[in-house]
Curated annotation (Swiss-Prot):
GO terms for molecular function: ubiquitin protein ligase binding. GO terms for biological process: anaphase-promoting complex-dependent catabolic process; exit from mitosis; metaphase/anaphase transition of mitotic cell cycle; positive regulation of mitotic actomyosin contractile ring contraction; protein K11-linked ubiquitination; protein ubiquitination; regulation of meiotic cell cycle; regulation of mitotic cell cycle. This is Anaphase-promoting complex subunit 2. It is found in: Cytoplasm; Nucleus. The gene is APC2. Pathway: Protein modification; protein ubiquitination. Present with 432 molecules/cell in log phase SD medium. SMART domains: APC2 (SM01013). Component of the anaphase promoting complex/cyclosome (APC/C), a cell cycle-regulated E3 ubiquitin-protein ligase complex that controls progression through mitosis and the G1 phase of the cell cycle. The APC/C is thought to confer substrate specificity and, in the presence of ubiquitin-conjugating E2 enzymes, it catalyzes the formation of protein-ubiquitin conjugates that are subsequently degraded by the 26S proteasome. The APC/C is composed of at least 13 subunits that stay tightly associated throughout the cell cycle: APC1, APC2, APC4, APC5, APC9, APC11, CDC16, CDC23, CDC26, CDC27, DOC1, MND2 and SWM1. APC2 interacts directly with APC11 thereby anchoring APC11 to the core complex. The keyword Nucleus applies. Belongs to the cullin family. Keywords: Cell cycle, Cell division, Cytoplasm, Mitosis, Nucleus, Ubl conjugation pathway. GO terms for cellular component: anaphase-promoting complex; cytoplasm.
Length: 853
């Protein structure tokens, strides 16, 4: 239905006609009274019109003259029009026609005035309350002047025409109307919303009431889902619970607005789909927190999310959103390698729950791999976490402070489930038979499934059905032309992909294992090492077999790209590990035989190694470092073992690896203290110099010790500092002596001695308290500086200063440090050899001799 407002005559023509008709019909001069009535009715004369107040006595009299019997007015002062017409005159058809013409002209006059007023204020009608105010203004005179009583629909048609025009032409009003409905529904004011809908329906304009209700419903669902789903990750069936809650709370009101039954299954299904879409939208925005911060508590929400993800675009949006946040919060220099790796391991587990095919994880690994490869100590952190090694061994390999709490969390995360287990594969029931007639094996073997009746199914039928039901995997899920066979779904394999090559990881494991075997007490290796070695061996052998085997892709027989050199290097490292383990086993057997020889001290447990496979060559070691003198008794006993070995192995000769031996010593002090330590041969030789046969105190200078031990003073100072930190030696007036009587508990001495040594570095030439505080702040910031330079490489001064402002705790007061003060401190570190200044104005960390990852 459409409305069209037809133009009317000029107002003066209409007014003159009213005066003429009234004078002719009533035969009296009522022109003045009629003009007063017209002025009172007109909405355009704001000062003299009704102003929403009842008419005066004079106007009431003229209304009675025009409309006698106007006792009641409902809804617009309804009266019996035929009686009114007959009561005025009854002079034939001519007078009746004049009366009808008078009423028609009066209606025309009022419609003209209403339209004029409406279009005069058209641009100022911005809200529903504005038009409702004018509508009330227009309808007020009609309560007393029943000019539309012959056909009430005439006024309704006129009013709806104005509404229709307003809705179609006033864009601002239409937008505000839409906003108003949304707000009413958001505020649960469904009564006012229903009034607005009824107004819209009467206007029948370009703005559909159904469309508005649906949009408002969708907005209401969005808000309801935000309030009930956001950051709730540990509840099952979240979509269904939220949907049921919404239906119970609001559906009766919405069904009334829409005008449909409450049990409309098609509509409720559509609404439920909206809840699924909102769940997907909310979880996509929260995917970083779900996978990185809340996992594994958020596993239930990942499973629910997996059920509703039907399109590869859903996965793409999730991966894109996740990587944006992961890069922002994790892949930045202020996050330590331990924390970054911990978050990444959680990411792997979470995304394998979300997408068991591993395609999402493949995209994530491809993105983060370059960032992790910039972290030099990644392989050390991963290996120490896999092996759950103590903090002391980790610090020997990594020259920056490690958050042990985060490292323990990483260990727990790696070991809460088998690292070698495919996270996405559900364990199969061993008693459950395959649906195929034959269980085909990888190496061509086959086993007959005897429980399946052969007579009811032929082998080709099973194969045919399998290929008929086969659905191709979407290529859009992963970038490029990566085949699904390359996608990793094993936690260890995914972590292994972070490195440039498998050979690099295995080589680092070999180095770590070598150090462990060198320091191993007796000959038994911890089980965690054997488990890790078994895991590496299985994956490397599997990878090697795959690399050298044929495969079929898209029906074409082909070969994988060349990986033979890497596979050969992997196998070479594994062979070296096997030789080292064999050396340990043979050493145990040989040691047992040696201990049976009379005259040998059985407390010595030698290891006989093959230098070529242990990556150890005495010729490569500094001659001065290995020329120190051992204690005479120890050297004599070791020589006995060497002679016995030559007797047991004719033609072979032993060479002592002085820098690899370990000695367990027990120190006893005069105050009753006892200390048991595992130390190196060098450390043992140093403390042995203070062993007094007659219990007299020994005081030795650095020069005396250097000459006696044949150790260079810088190296010897480092060895002496070790014993000072242990609370064994005391340096006073340039000489070293044993602390036989301690004023404090020995454990407390161990804690305070390193602090005293560290605090000695804080002594400044400037006695100013403020300068000392600044220097202390810079000293405390040193681990952050080393961490940044280690993870990111060389950095310029202003960049280091900016990062320190972000990373150093605020209560340390680093914000008060100027760029010049930092530059002076960095130059001091460079002079001490701890940092290196590059010509381009950058600083880098000085390598300490260990192989960095």
């Amino acid at each position: 239905m459409s409305f069209q407002i037809t133009p009317t005559r000029d107002l003066k023509v209409i007014t003159d006609e009213l005066q003429t008709l009234s004078s002719y019909i009533f035969h009296t001069n009522i022109v003045d009274d009629l003009n007063s009535l017209l002025t009172w009715m007109s909405p355009n004369d704001a000062k003299s019109n009704h102003q929403l107040r009842p008419p005066s006595l004079r106007i009431k009299n003229i209304i009675k003259v025009l409309f006698p019997n106007n006792a009641t007015t409902s809804p617009y002062s309804m009266i019996n029009t035929s009686q009114a017409n007959n009561s005025i005159v009854n002079e034939g058809n001519t007078n009746k026609e004049l009366q009808l013409q008078l009423f028609s002209t009066l209606k025309e006059f009022y419609i003209f005035q209403v339209r004029y007023h409406f279009f005069l204020h058209f641009n100022n009608i911005n809200y529903l309350k504005d038009i409702q105010r004018w509508e009330n203004y227009y309808e007020f005179p009609l309560r007393y002047v029943p000019i539309f009583d012959v056909n009430v629909n005439d006024w309704a048609l006129e009013l709806n025409s104005l509404r229709h025009y307003l809705l179609n032409r006033n864009i601002k009003f239409k937008n505000n109307l839409r906003t108003r409905l949304d707000k009413l529904i958001m505020d649960d004011d469904f009564d006012l919303a229903d009034n607005l809908i009824q107004w819209l329906k009467s206007a029948n304009g370009s703005l559909s009431s159904t469309e508005l209700i649906v949009n408002a419903l969708y907005s209401k669902i969005n808000k309801f889902c935000e309030d009930n789903m956001s950051r709730v990750w540990n509840k099952r069936f979240m979509i269904m619970e939220t949907f049921n809650k919404f239906i119970n709370q609001y559906w009766s009101q919405f069904s009334k607005l829409v005008g449909c039954p409450e049990d409309d299954h098609e509509l409720t299904t559509t609404v439920f789909n909206c809840f699924e879409s909102n769940f997907l939208r909310i979880r996509t925005n929260e995917i970083f927190d779900i996978c990185v911060l809340a996992y594994p508590d958020s596993k239930v929400t990942l499973l629910e999310l997996r059920k509703i993800m039907k399109d590869f675009k859903d996965y793409t949006n999730i991966v894109t959103t996740f990587l944006s946040d992961f890069k922002k919060y994790i892949l930045n220099p202020s996050v330590t390698t331990v924390d970054a790796l911990l978050r990444y391991v959680k990411t792997i587990k979470a995304f394998l729950v979300l997408d068991p095919t591993g395609r999402c994880l493949h995209s994530i690994t491809t993105f983060v791999k370059p960032y992790f490869q910039e972290r030099k100590h990644l392989v050390n952190v991963l290996l120490y976490a896999m092996l759950d090694l103590p903090e002391e061994e980790l610090k020997e390999k990594i020259n920056f402070n490690v958050d042990m709490k985060a490292l323990l969390s990483l260990v727990d995360t790696l070991h809460d489930s088998d690292i070698n287990q495919d996270t996405n594969i559900t364990k199969r029931d061993k008693n459950k038979k395959s649906p195929f007639l034959w269980n085909l094996k990888v190496k061509g073997k086959r086993e007959l499934n005897k429980d399946l009746p052969i007579r009811h199914a032929m082998l080709y039928e099973h194969i045919l059905n399998y290929y008929i039901a086969w659905v191709p995997e979407p290529n859009d899920m992963i970038p490029g032309n990566i085949k699904s066979s390359y996608i990793k779904t094993n936690l260890f394999e995914v972590l292994l992909d972070l490195f440039e090559s498998r050979e690099f990881f295995i080589s680092e494991f070999r180095n770590l294992l070598t150090d462990r075997l060198f320091t191993l007490k007796f000959y038994t290796l911890d089980e965690k090492w054997t488990r890790c070695l078994k895991l590496i061996r299985e994956k490397i052998v599997k990878f090697t077999e795959t690399s050298h085997s044929n495969y079929i892709t898209n029906g074409i027989l082909g070969l994988l790209e060349t990986t033979a050199p890497a596979a050969d290097a992997d196998q070479s490292n594994l062979n070296s590990i096997d030789v080292m383990l064999w050396d340990i086993k043979c050493s145990e057997e040989l040691c047992r035989k040696m201990h049976e020889v009379a005259g040998l001290d059985p407390i010595i447990f030698p290891k006989f190694i093959s230098l070529l496979y242990w990556k150890y060559n005495c010729d490569t070691q500094g001659s001065n470092d290995l020329a120190f003198h051992l204690p005479i008794d120890l050297e004599r006993e070791l020589q006995k073992y060497s002679d016995i070995y030559s007797q047991l192995k004719p033609g072979r000769k032993l060479q002592l690896c002085k820098d690899k031996g370990k000695v367990e010593i027990q120190l006893a002090f005069k105050d009753g203290r006892k200390l048991v330590l595992d130390v190196s041969l060098e450390q043992c030789s140093v403390i042995n110099q203070f062993d007094s046969p007659n219990d007299e105190p020994i005081c030795l200078s650095l020069e005396q010790l250097s000459e006696s031990l044949n150790i260079a003073p810088p190296r010897l100072t480092h060895l002496l500092d070790f014993w000072i930190q242990k609370g064994v030696l005391l340096k006073e007036n340039g000489t070293y002596s044993v602390i036989e009587h301690s004023e404090m508990d020995f454990d407390q001495a161990q804690k305070t001695a390193p602090m005293e040594i560290e605090n000695s570095n804080y002594e400044l030439h400037n006695d100013s308290e403020i300068e000392r505080k600044y220097e202390l702040t810079l000293q405390r910031s040193l681990p952050f500086i080393e961490g940044m330079l280690t993870n990111l490489g060389a950095m310029k001064l202003h960049k280091i200063h900016s990062f320190l402002k972000i990373t150093v705790p605020k209560d340390w007061g680093y914000n008060r440090i100027t760029l010049q003060q930092l530059e002076g401190y960095l130059n001091t570190l460079a002079d001490e050899g701890r940092l290196k200044y590059i010509a381009n104005g950058s600083y880098e960390i000085v390598k300490n001799g260990h192989k960095n990852s």
